[in-house]
Amino acid sequence: MRKKGVGLAAVLAMATVAVPSSAEVIYKLDTQCSLKGAAPVSCAVEATNEADATLYRHQIGSQLVTIRISDAPIRMAMWDAKAKQWQSLKRASARFSSNTICFNGRELCVVNPNYLNSVREDNPAATAKRDLVRVHFGADGRIDASCYDDGCEVMQK
């Protein structure tokens, strides 16, 4: 069972998040990631289902960045290792043509065709002939706005 958000969320730090024995590994992926707009580098992604969320652990060199996507209601958060707590994401975006997902602008970007293909499979009507989807989250971590392609330019005005 994969949990996804609407669009991107529907479309995705040094974490010390342990994987409980009840966690189910969905997949592992060797891919490319970038932090804070830097050039992409090799990274490994592990997706695991847990009680009420899916965790995406991104191992980038010595750094581990974890994104949590939870359902009911859909929320996305990033683990803040210094504060030792989850921080709600402010925004996320996905570009289907490059299989790239970015969180909080370009704080973390990852090439992840596994996730985006599953988003397309689970939301064929919403994602048909779409390339870009952006999601904005409110202070409570819930989606408060989303847009596709040229509609994202309208939202910025």
Regions flagged by a language model, labelled:
Residues M1-L8:
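Bacterial N-terminal signal peptides that target proteins for export
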Residues A9-T16:
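Bacterial N-terminal signal peptides
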Residues A18-P20:
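N-terminal signal peptide c-region/cleavage motif recognized by signal peptidases
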Residues A23-K157:
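Cysteine-centric segments in proteins
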